[in-house]
Amino acid sequence: CGAVRFRDREPVSRELVARMTDTMAHRGPDDDGFYYDRYVGLGHRRLSIVDLGGGHQPMADADEKLWVVFNGEIYNFPEVRAELEGLGHRFRTNSDTEVILYGYKQWGKGVLQRLNGMFGFALWDCEREELLVARDRMGIKFIYYAIEDGVLYFGSEIRPILAAGALSRRVDPV
């Protein structure tokens, strides 16, 4: 989950991102992590499926210019990884998450056409100051988001957005 203050570009509250992330503790008991860059905050709770020791998130490329939070599984990551290694990319883990980073570095948004799996992720490109939020083609993994007062809030479930106070909890009378 995370938050981006795209309008005023003021720093994102660390307490806010921690509160958002804590709402997903039930989904990821194995690890948690955070990344902050100016007006961006990313938080992650991890359930270890692939690379039990090396998949800490948010995960960065070797230059720490790309950061990703990822939920799901990339089924064809060994094939995509082999292709990227053939193109000169060096991997530090055995995690499928890292394939997203180097795939984006190589192909940009075209990496989405190469990924087969069930996933949702948010990737922050520090140099371009761009956030790519994506999910699998079938929509197996969800991405929830809200934009309120110049801040984008997102998560793999609604709880982080509610914890951020970005949505009211009133019933729609219609």
Residue positions per predicted region:
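Cysteine-centered catalytic environments shared across enzyme families
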Residues: 1-174
